[in-house]
Amino acid sequence: MGLSDGEWHLVLNVWGKWETDLAGHGQEVLIRLFKSHPETLEKFDKFKHLKSEDDMRRSFDLRKHGNTVLTALGGILKKKGHHEAELKPLAQSHATKHKIPIKYLEFISEAIIHVLHSKHPAEFGADAQAAMKKALELFRNDIAAKIKELGFHG
């Protein structure tokens, strides 16, 4: 299920566009996630009080967390599937500390695809979207396996 060199090129090319504003794009991804799947907000104690989209847009902490999420994901994507070392601590924290259901990884992947397309439509055509979906699926499958190894099946 790995990606070809051409697919990785498409993924990393559009990712390069995002790196100019990881905090802003990350905040947009989290807003999209919370609006599309309000139940996900309950897993974030420090964001539960953000009831409206305006509250979310004004939140420095949400922007900061968006940066953290996309920085970690970017580091994983740049490994082109050789991300074992990066996944272990991420799986550990998501399974034991945050207890994030595996299904939520699919939800955030959908949000990433949506925001990428809305922000960079020229660079994120059908081929790039397909490649990114494949890369995110690879990430999700690998981290889900690690999370399950830790005994968390949420």
From Swiss-Prot:
EC number(s) stated in the UniProt entry for this protein: 1.7.-.-, 1.11.1.-
Catalytic activity: Fe(III)-heme b-[protein] + nitric oxide + H2O = Fe(II)-heme b-[protein] + nitrite + 2 H(+); H2O2 + AH2 = A + 2 H2O
Keywords associated with the record: Cytoplasm, Heme, Iron, Metal-binding, Muscle protein, Oxidoreductase, Oxygen transport, Phosphoprotein, Transport
Chief location of this protein within or outside the cell: cytoplasm
Molecular function GO terms recorded: heme binding; metal ion binding; nitrite reductase activity; oxygen binding; oxygen carrier activity; peroxidase activity
A Pfam family this chain is assigned to: Globin
Protein name as it appears in the record: Myoglobin
Biological source species: Pusa sibirica
GN (gene name): MB
